[in-house]
């Protein structure tokens, strides 16, 4: 284990990455497809797009902070005006596949299709090509990371094995920058695992 103090650019003391997973109602639909008939449950995701995005953007602007919005391609297609606003305000739009697929359960070909469709949707809506990738709920395989690299991703933000960025060995002679995440810093576990039977 390397316990040396990291050397950050410009003599900075530390680095942090603020990320938002912009799943909208898609998160709920992927957990349980029957949610399509549950307006209250769907409204939890729709609220983020109706009010949450604008409020987050306002706070970020007020504080002078830039963030990364990991976005499924489907969400970009459903909410193009929100995605364009995020881009116009100078935030990064990164890929969260196409339709919140559990990449670990897909074949390599299916993963590639989800990656490709997600990237193309963001390109079509925003005119930018994402360079960062997060698998929905971090469910992925080593093949997923190789596919991300193949499709031009500069980094992944999925794994929880460090608190510093590092080069992840893809076991094929290549590496991909990993910017680790930590579930204890997410709001999702406190929220998502309590939606049944109340809704």
What are these regions (language model features)?
Residues 182-199:
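Catalytic grooves of carbohydrate-active enzymes
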């Amino acid at each position: 284990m390397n316990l040396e103090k990291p050397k950050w650019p410009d003599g900075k003391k530390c680095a942090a990455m603020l990320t938002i997973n912009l799943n909208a109602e898609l998160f709920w639909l992927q957990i349980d497809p029957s949610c399509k008939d549950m307006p209250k449950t769907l409204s939890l995701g729709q609220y983020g797009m109706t009010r949450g995005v604008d409020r987050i953007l306002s706070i970020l602007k007020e504080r002078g902070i830039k963030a990364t919005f990991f976005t499924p391609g489907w969400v970009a297609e459903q909410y193009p005006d929100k995605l364009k606003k995020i881009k116009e305000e100078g935030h990064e739009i990164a890929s969260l596949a196409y339709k919140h697929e559990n990449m670990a359960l897909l074949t390599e070909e299916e993963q590639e299709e989800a990656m490709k469709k997600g990237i193309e949707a963001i390109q079509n809506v925003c005119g930018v090509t994402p360079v960062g990738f997060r698998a929905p709920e971090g469910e992925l395989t080593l093949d997923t990371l190789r596919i991300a690299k193949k499709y031009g991703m500069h980094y992944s933000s999925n794994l929880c094995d460090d608190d510093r960025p590092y080069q992840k060995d893809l076991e094929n002679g290549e590496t991909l920058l990993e910017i680790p995440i930590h579930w204890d810093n997410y709001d999702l576990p406190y929220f998502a695992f309590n939606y049944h039977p109340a809704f």
